[in-house]
Amino acid sequence: RIAFLSDHEGVGNLYSCAHDGSDLRRHTDHAEFYARHAAGDGTRIVYQCAGELWLVDDLSPGAVPHRLDVHLCGPRAGRRTYQVPAAQHVDGVCVDETGRASAVVVRGSLHWLTHRDGPARTLTDTPGVRVRLPEMLGESGQVAYVTDAEGEDAVEIAHLPRASGARPPRRLAAGRLGRVLEMVADPAGERLALASHDGRLLLVRVGETEGQESQEEQAGQEGQEGQEEQEGQAGQSVACDVTELIRSVNGPVRDLAFSPDGAWLTWSHPGIGRSLRQIRMARIAGPDTGPVLDVTDGRFEDENPVFTRDGRYLAFLSWRGFDPVYDVHTGDLSFPLGCRPYLVTLSSATPSPFALNPEGRPAAGGLDPVGYEDEAGDGTVTVEVEGLASRVTPFPVTASKYSALHPVAGGGLVWLRWPISGALGETFANPDDLSGRPTLEHFNVGRAQKSELVGDLDWFAVSGDGTRLVVMDEGDLRAVPATEAGDGDSTVWIDLRRILHQVDPAAEWRQSFDEAGRIIRAHFWDPGMCGIDWDAILAQYRPLVERVASPDEFADLLREVLGELGTSHAYVAAARRNEGPPHYQRPQGLLGADLVCREGQWVVRRILPGDSSDSRARSPLAGSGIREGAVLTHVDGRAVDPLTGPYPLLAGAGGTTVELTFAPAGESGGGAARRVAVVPLVDDRPLRYQHWVARRREVVRELSGGKCGYLHIPDMGGSGWAQFNRDLRGEVFRPALIVDVRGNAGGHISELVVEKLTRTILGWDVTRDAQPVSYASDAPRGPVVALADEATASDGDMITAAFKLLGLGPVVGQRTWGGVVGMTGRHRLGDGTVITVPMNAAWFAAYGWSVENRGVDPDLEALRTPLDWAEGRHAQLDDAVHLALTLLAERPAAAPPAHTDIPDRTRPKLPPRNGQD
């Protein structure tokens, strides 16, 4: 009998059947948790269920599984506390008013760290509680942050360390905020603005009442004696005002920013679709509070609005550049350079700093004669609503990709500028080049001058007064000036080793389990959870957290929990502890060739030809003069072992230079040996993939007599788009076309592929010395047949459905994977585990919701059996080509016109005048 696990009856259990598939039996009856990881010895089957081992003695109808009680004598070392290096676990930084110190979040704990010397001080570090999004409250000596100490997000206000003693933190609005995505404080530290997952923009007043102040003063007077006991304790919940300013119906608002006087709040508001956003603002303080104002109209993607520190301007980033760039291969046009910062003068009485000046611009390095800095505002914001949108002006900088816009001292701005690079990372000559990282730039608004502050960084934070920046660069934290490039004297390197954080794995896993549950509940595509009692599911699995003893086990548990969603794209990636120095590890070296052992010699049987259009698909032996049949004898002067071969000698050699010694074919020690220097590949999959595609194209050519073109699309991302366009022009001109999406890993560009394949030939462009070209160009000339299988997934499901719904052509193969509830982004839990949430569900007029968990059925079912595979037969390709040729016979391919019936363009003879012969 054949034993296997299946959940076809709703829950995973152990089954068996006869070799022909008959006599199906169920051997276990687990109704709550899945039976998993079955293994057998030919008679007995062992498996795990809910963290316990179970054994089935045989596959007879009456066999009853029984639990194995395994007692471990040693401690579960994976649950012991351990220390982590802070530099590898920084989750957020908030700089104080002057840039002297920062509040640093390290793996869910919050620490106060002076930049130059001084000790680190723990503000809050409670095992099982995660702290996020710290914000300084002006110069009040307090810091706000988001905590989940009560099981839902709340705001907590903590006092910075001081000599008079510790004061307990205050907790506000627990359970009233949803999942907080962003939080900013006004300059005075009296209010917080929060963006929630459900589209709400909330205002929270954080000022203390008289009773609260007296209680905290009393706590502070207890002195240093009780200080250590109070550190890390839970905050006291107090009442507060939470005001909903606005609610978005198209997803969360983001990029919140207060004006320098604290009277105005601006943000980026989502529009219909996935890219349109508009800048909005509202007066939230003073006697003239009024309705929300639209700064921009939502036609473009506008984001990251900020007020300049003088209060005269609003700046934002906008993707509204429409200077098309021609595609060098297909002639298509795209907009890769669409982003630029823009400036809005808030009052018509304020001149644009970019307008022409009758006095001209100052000489380089000189002072502006109009005295911009002297006339700058005091931070009070005056908004003239009439004509606001018409006062939007682009910055005089090159269009590129920008992010992280912030105001700094002197009325200037800083931002990150990103290089334009390819989706596959092949833009830069050296794969290890860091030039794909952003550059931090400063713009002096008064002088309209741009300067570079820091090159190649990760992210940065700004001090409260805008004079200093804290820059994160691959684990190194440093403070630099905000308005000019730093030097040795002005740059302060911040020693993160002063932060000592002990991780309690058991407490972290409990917190991360609950946090994962909240994230799923907040972001799952259906608010009703498709009928699932999510709280009951979490309660069912929560006791199993106490059995977890490693990050991998915790990730495995979360996979079971997310599996209860019955939905695709619910992934879990395990955390890594990263304690201690990183292990020295280099990738295996690969030669891009197949070697076989013949009579104790390692012979080059085949050098993969590769593809010159793919820089990753080239064998190191190509062009070296080594031919198939040569014998590899030495690697870096070390003899190749006849038994283990060259691979142990190439361990760790990937990406570095090695010397290979070859003997001519048939020679073991004599003959003229040849030494070559090569750089082994770290990954030969692109090379083998291109060879795989070339072989199948040859099969299609042979089966069709050259009448069928062949395209394979490995995924619906950057590599799939590249592969599709790599061969489209050469294959689409043939009478029929096979589009192979077997094994397609999904992505998001199926619409682009469909646009190409749905082009119709309406006519021909005829020229004198070349073959006619179809209009539309690169359109299929005849029938198109799709190939799909059970590994055609996600956006591969989508394009297979599109083939059928649009009538592009029949689908041959197997039913597709069936996963069309996509994800957007990834969520990192407190312990470092990463999860994804199914957020975007696909619905089709013809299928409804049924493609999810079902897939798309082919028009012609074809299966490549293991025997076909072993004997080199291509059953699915055979059927696809046969069907394409049948359709071609019924509907011949479009052909250019014959060179006949050419119009006569000779000038007609002038007729006689009227009344004359």
PLM region spans:
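Extended, small/polar residue-biased N-terminal targeting/export presequences
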Residues: 546-603, 671-696, 881-916
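Short coil/turn segments that connect the beta-strands within blades of beta-propeller domains
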Residues: 42-43, 98-100, 139-141, 188-190, ...
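PDZ/PDZ-like domain segments forming the peptide/carboxylate-binding groove
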Residues: 586-642, 840-841
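Short loop/turn segments that connect beta-strands within beta-propeller blades
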Residues: 18-22, 58-61, 115-118, 160-164, ...
